[in-house]
Regions:
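Short, well-ordered alpha-helical segments enriched in acidic and aromatic residues
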Residues: 29-42
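Short active-site-proximal "capping" loops at secondary-structure junctions
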Residues: 44, 50-51
Length: 128
């Protein structure tokens, strides 16, 4: 990714914040296995289109999603990070060669060093 910016941050629990920063760095590096390693067999990812359960289904989501975020061709800005114990909330936006995300948001529940639950929603415009 070309650009990563962070404009606001509140941290109450360093462990949860660390896990999410690892997750975002792995995503930005297009390291699929590292992204998936943040989840457990009980993890759930809810998006505006579907619900994914466990690492296998979650990996399937990221395989398709990460295709639109090539390294060195993506501008990703982290607008807000709020960490409150197990709860992590982020707001972001991104521009890629095939996708404009004017508003993206994720909410994470982190337990025992892993992402237990996650929601994702975004205002996305596919290009080409």
């Amino acid at each position: 990714m070309k650009k990563v910016e962070q404009t606001e941050q509140t941290v109450v629990n360093e462990t949860s914040g660390f896990i999410i920063m690892h997750h975002l760095a792995s995503f930005q590096d297009n390291d699929l296995e590292s992204v998936v390693s943040d989840y457990t067999n009980e993890s759930v990812l809810v998006t505006q289109d579907a619900t994914y359960k466990g690492p296998g289904e979650i990996k399937g989501f990221f395989v398709a999603f990460m295709e639109h975020f090539p390294k060195q061709q993506t501008s990703f800005t982290l607008d807000k990070v709020i960490v409150n114990n197990e709860l992590v909330y982020i707001v972001w936006h991104a521009d890629t060669p095939t996708l404009e995300v004017s508003f993206g948001t994720d909410t994470f529940i982190v337990r025992h060093g892993k992402i237990y639950q996650q929601t994702f929603a975004g205002q996305m415009k596919f290009i080409n």
